[in-house]
């Protein structure tokens, strides 16, 4: 939902385009509004996620429509996620009781050093049942197995009949690395994490300097 206002500003409903959201867990065709692909976390694993995180000094979140669902609506990192994606926050008394709908992604937020231990704990508990990775030092993504931005981009590429060499991808977060490595042209923002810059083909200007527009002008329109 964070990119929906941008998609509307670009008039993608008229001109066509796709939104790959939730780290690739969902693909939406902007011209029709139809979800053409979605993979959700098996419901039987939700109890395990909740059980592993509930008693920790961390905030567990998921998404329902344009709302963030959490037991900790006042948490600073919940507020940050709300601000980044322009989503409202709904506080609930019991996360597991409330979340009976299909879940594309869960997010765990905490201070970076502490979250590293949480990441190790969850990976040890779930093994290969889920994709668990950091998008920011303070955000830990919990996704369905084999879901990341690269796998979603490949799914869309095959549907559109494109070659990898025809794809450019811009990113700044740790969860963008797979996508940047997959694309024929991988572009990191100037404000990107250093790990992202190390794997890219080109570093563009920062988000604040309209770096995506700069890259489009240089490599596509230019």
Question: Positions of the model-derived regions?
Answer:
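Active-site phosphate-binding/coordination module
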Residues: 1-77
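A generic "binding-loop/recognition-motif" signal
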Residues: 2, 23, 65-66, 138, ...
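Class I S-adenosyl-L-methionine
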Residues: 4, 8-11, 54, 119-124, ...
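Short, structured coil segments at secondary-structure junctions
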Residues: 13-15, 23, 31, 125-128, ...
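Conserved strand-loop elements at the edges of beta-sheets that form or border functional pockets
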Residues: 21, 134, 206
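Conserved acidic, metal-coordinating active-site core of Asp-based
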Residues: 48-52, 56-170
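Mg2+-dependent phosphoryl-transfer enzymes with acidic/Ser/Thr/Gly-rich catalytic loops
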Residues: 141-222
């Amino acid at each position: 939902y964070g990119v929906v206002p941008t998609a509307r500003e670009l008039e993608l409903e008229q001109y066509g385009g796709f939104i790959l959201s939730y780290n690739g867990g969902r693909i939406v065709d902007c011209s029709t509004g139809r979800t053409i692909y979605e993979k959700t976390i098996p419901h039987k694993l939700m109890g395990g996620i909740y059980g592993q995180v509930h008693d920790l000094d961390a905030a567990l979140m998921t998404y329902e429509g344009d709302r963030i669902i959490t037991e900790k609506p006042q948490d600073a990192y919940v507020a940050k996620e709300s601000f980044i994606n322009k989503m409202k926050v709904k506080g609930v008394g019991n996360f597991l009781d409330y979340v009976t709908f299909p879940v594309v992604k869960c997010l765990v937020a905490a201070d970076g050093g502490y979250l590293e231990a949480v990441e190790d704990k969850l990976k040890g508990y779930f093994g290969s049942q889920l994709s668990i990775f950091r998008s920011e030092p303070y955000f830990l993504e919990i996704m369905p197995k084999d879901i990341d931005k690269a796998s979603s981009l490949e799914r869309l590429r095959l549907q559109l009949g494109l070659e990898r060499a025809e794809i450019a991808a811009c990113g700044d977060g740790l969860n963008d690395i797979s996508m940047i490595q997959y694309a024929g042209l991988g572009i990191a923002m100037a404000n990107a994490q250093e790990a992202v810059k190390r794997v890219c083909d080109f570093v563009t200007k920062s988000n604040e300097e309209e770096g995506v527009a700069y890259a489009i002008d240089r490599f596509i329109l230019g």
